[in-house]
Swiss-Prot record:
Residues 374-390 have a biased composition (Pro residues). GO terms for biological process: mRNA 3'-end processing; termination of RNA polymerase II transcription. It holds the Pfam family CID. It comes from the Eukaryota. This is Polyadenylation and cleavage factor homolog 11. InterPro entries: CID_dom (IPR006569), ENTH_VHS (IPR008942), PCF11-like (IPR045154), Pcf11_CID (IPR047415). Residues 3-135 form the CID domain. Residues 227-242, 342-353, 571-581 have a biased composition (Low complexity). Residues 142-176, 188-301, 340-395, 570-643, 728-755 are annotated as: Disordered. SMART domains: RPR.
Length: 823
């Protein structure tokens, strides 16, 4: 008992530390819940209590913790059953207290529950009914599937359901695929109710087999998108009763006209009393029809759901019920135009779209016109309809993608052992050429989540998976570098963990994200010899692509010739003899009409401008400014130039480093006033007046003295260029001394033991000594110090200390001699 209480207390303290959407803390809470499975009731109670007491901004975080526990804790556990009892009240409380952003996030959590088996569909239906009372825009899930999508064809709002009176009719023409939402479903979803409904269905199917077959014919199976496409559903429902009436009517003559009657609402099945003896069981051959048929594709009316036309199944071609044409002597008709003026025969698909659609009437009374030619024995070529067995092919899915802005260079190369290989594709197989043979490459690793419009789908690498995208099935699989994803055989380029892929599927935009980091790229060790004959073709295609990508350098011959003329390499054009000489030159500041500021007309240089300037003699030669040399284009030189880099750090990109900025170059060249002129170190703007400047300059002086030595020292800081006479005459001795000096071990830095030193400052320079511990002698010493006549000074200050001591001893001796008395 104590362990359970301590586990609940620890979990309460850890949950109270959750302040923001931190994935690490949420994972920690999930791991704790997995470790404390025995205290599952207490932990669920702690989570519920914290949800009701925390601030509204943290309620979403608590729901994230619940979602993580439900999805990640190992089975079996008691959390699923415990959360199922309280999830409706917890979700409703978080939804009621949250703002629009929190409600959107809660909806995303609810969508993920629909694709898993965490809760029963009835529980999700109860949750949706609760939230729908708070927000009418909240979609209600299907009690059978649990999906909470608004465009689910099996979902219908409660307001669209029919009244209870019509529901009691045994022959109500309802679709078998639709599920009408009833708020009383929760109370009625019991085994007893299910058995009762089963008996009712058996009773309705009990009348004879003939009525059962007629019922199947009378109630065709409707499409799930009938509610979205009212035009198609209306045409289907209006054609079925007419066919039944035609079948029940006695046929007196095979060519007798069948008059259409006004449509009536379908009667219940029990009200139809029909003499089965009057029905002919022999199937009569169809009467050839000469009436024109409209083969134009049916236009879909606009619907409330965007993009629903793309997923509407193509219905089989329905042959319209064409009445048999009456005899010529009985039924009047409008004669067709003569055959001489009629256009030549064309294919039905090319000819009939030009004709107006035939008028639809309730009967064949007045005003009925027939568009077919008269039925006479003249040989007229009838319009052939497509055979009954020929069906139009189903429309193929259309894919297109928008290139995302990736943070990686757009090339198809991979590096293996420091060597770059070009990735080539044979259909959807990625290969590289290695050792003259093709090797297949592919992604490998654990399964990844592919998020399509916020819905995750778990995919295995190198294994195609069928995914339902808005009612349409698509084969999706991971690809290879530069073609990371395939949907329906169409490649998409993306980045794992990067920006989303914007794909247009059947006219509707979708956002696709590749989650996680970049997967491992594996290379098959065995060459794919069956792809060897494709290598030459792929090489040629790659050369063509590279050649097409190279920009064509435009040569400006006009500016080149002008530069030659300004350098007096080319002679000036001959002056026209008819040109007037005594003309006043135009003002220099007035522009010539039709020219822009650059001296161009319509985008090209004016060829007559130098000739016009030459007419005014030498008085205006100084005003003739030669055209400036054209700057090299960024394409030709390969370097783009700009004035200044972008100011915002968020706009920075790796490609911006390839651009030459004039402001950056000027800043690097310009001499800074706040930098040291010797080393370039940046200091303050006091121009040498602050203590920082003075200390820095003193440091330079000390470095120079230590490097070159003082003026009084006789040591030479550098080696002489030419050897001296003694060194030249005795080379062996010099070599031996050099060898002896080289053999000497390096002496440690001199240092005086700090135990007996009273003042740890140099008596010459006044700086403090650096004290260190000597491990060899196990004592504390003063670094780089020497003892000069009882005074501890730096090694560099030893000469100055000795000189000062000699001077002081000389003065002391002279003073002593002066004080001695004379004998």
């Amino acid at each position: 008992m104590e362990s359970v209480e301590s586990a609940a207390r620890d979990y309460r303290e850890t949950l109270a530390e959750l302040r923001n959407n931190n994935k690490t803390q949420i994972n920690l809470l999930t791991i704790l819940a997995d470790d404390f499975k025995k205290a599952a009731p207490q932990i669920v109670e702690v989570i519920e209590r914290h949800l009701t007491t925390c601030s509204p901004s943290q309620k979403l975080l608590v729901m994230y913790v619940c979602d993580s526990i439900l999805k990640n804790v190992k089975k079996p556990n008691d959390y699923d059953a415990l959360f199922a009892r309280k999830i409706v009240s917890m979700f409703e409380h978080a939804f009621r207290q949250g703002d629009e952003r929190i409600r959107t996030s809660l909806y995303r959590i609810r969508v993920t529950w629909a694709s898993t088996t965490l809760f029963m569909p009835s529980k999700l239906y109860e949750l949706d009914m609760k939230i729908n009372k708070l927000d009418p825009n909240w979609p209600i899930s299907n009690p059978q599937t649990g999906r909470a999508l608004r465009d689910d064809p099996q979902v219908m709002a409660p307001s669209q359901s029919r009244p209870a009176g019509n529901a009691t009719s045994p022959a109500a023409s309802t679709s078998t695929n639709r599920v009408f939402v009833n708020p009383k479903f929760i109370g009625s979803s019991t085994p007893g109710a299910a058995s009762a409904s089963k008996t009712v269905v058996e009773k309705t199917k009990s009348p004879g087999t003939v009525n059962k077959e007629k019922q199947v014919k009378k109630e065709p199976k409707q499409d799930p998108l009938d509610k979205l496409l009212p035009s198609s559903s209306a045409s289907k429902t209006s054609s079925s009763p007419a066919g039944l009436k035609r079948k029940s009517a006695p046929s007196e003559h095979p060519n007798a006209p069948i008059r259409k009657k006004p449509q009536q609402p379908p009667k219940p099945q029990t009200a139809i009393d029909e003499d089965l003896r009057s029905i002919s069981l022999t199937k009569k051959p169809p009467v050839p029809s000469a009436q024109d048929q409209d083969f134009r594709p049916k236009t879909l009316k606009p619907t409330s759901v965007i993009g629903s036309h793309a997923f509407a199944p193509v219905a089989a071609p329905i042959r319209p019920m064409i009445p048999v044409p009456p005899p010529v002597s009985v039924a009047p008709f409008v004669p067709a135009p003569p055959l001489s003026s009629a256009p030549p025969f064309q294919h039905p698909q090319q000819h009939h779209p030009q004709l107006p659609p035939p008028p639809v009437h309730q009967g064949m009374g007045r005003g009925y016109h027939h568009n077919s030619p008269p039925q006479d024995p003249a040989p007229i070529v009838p319009v052939q309809a497509p055979p009954p067995q020929q069906h139009l092919p189903a429309p193929e899915n259309v894919y297109s993608s928008e290139q995302p802005k990736l943070d990686v260079p757009a090339n198809n190369r991979i590096f293996v052992d420091g060597k770059a290989y070009e990735v080539m594709f044979v259909d959807d197989t990625a290969v590289i050429e290695r050792g003259g043979a093709p090797h297949r490459i592919y992604f490998a690793g654990p399964p990844r989540n592919l998020v399509i419009d916020g819905i995750p789908h778990l995919l295995q690498f190198d294994t195609p998976t069928q995914i339902d995208i808005l009612g349409s099935k698509h084969m999706v699989k991971f690809g290879a570098p530069s073609r990371e994803l395939y949907i329906g055989g169409h490649p998409f380029k993306g980045q794992f963990g990067g920006p989303p892929i914007i794909a247009t599927i059947n006219g509707r935009r979708h956002e696709i994200r590749l989650t996680g980091s970049a997967p491992e790229v594996r290379i098959e060790p065995e060459p794919a010899y069956h792809l060897t004959h494709f290598l030459h073709k792929m090489r040629e295609e790659k050369k063509i692509e590279i050649a097409s990508e190279k920009p064509e350098k435009k040569e400006d011959w006009l500016s080149y010739l002008k530069n030659l003329r300004t350098r007096n390499i080319l002679p000036a054009p001959a002056r026209s003899p008819s040109s007037p000489r005594n003309q006043t030159p135009p003002p220099a500041n007035l522009p010539i009409p039709g020219m822009n500021n650059a001296g161009q007309r319509g985008g090209y240089h004016n060829r007559h401008q130098p000739q016009q300037n030459a007419r005014w003699g030498g008085a205006n030669k100084q005003q003739n400014i030669p055209p400036p040399p054209s700057d090299p284009s960024p394409i030709g030189s390969g370097v783009e130039k700009r004035s200044a880099p972008p100011a915002a750090i968020t706009d920075f990109n790796i490609r911006l480093l390839q651009i030459r900025y004039d402001s950056v170059v000027d800043a690097l060249i310009t001499k800074r006033a706040d930098a040291c002129k010797f080393c370039g170190m940046r200091l303050d703007d006091s121009q040498g007046k602050s203590k920082e400047w003075q200390d820095h300059m003193d440091w330079h002086v000390k470095q120079n003295l230590a490097r070159h030595g003082s003026n009084n020292s006789a040591a030479v800081p550098y080696r002489q260029w030419y050897p001296s006479t003694s060194t030249w005459l005795t080379p062996r001795a010099s070599d031996e001394t050099n060898e002896q000096e080289a053999d000497k071990p390096e002496e440690p830095l001199p240092g005086v033991a700090s135990s007996g030193v009273k003042t740890k400052e140099c008596s010459v320079c006044g700086e403090k000594f650096d004290e260190y511990y000597d491990d060899d002698e196990e004592t504390w010493r003063l670094r780089d110090t020497v003892n000069v006549h009882g005074k501890i000074v730096h090694s560099a200050c030893a000469s100055d200390a000795a000189r000062s001591l000699d001077n002081s001893s000389f003065f002391n001796d002279s003073d002593i001699k002066k004080e001695e008395p004379f004998d």
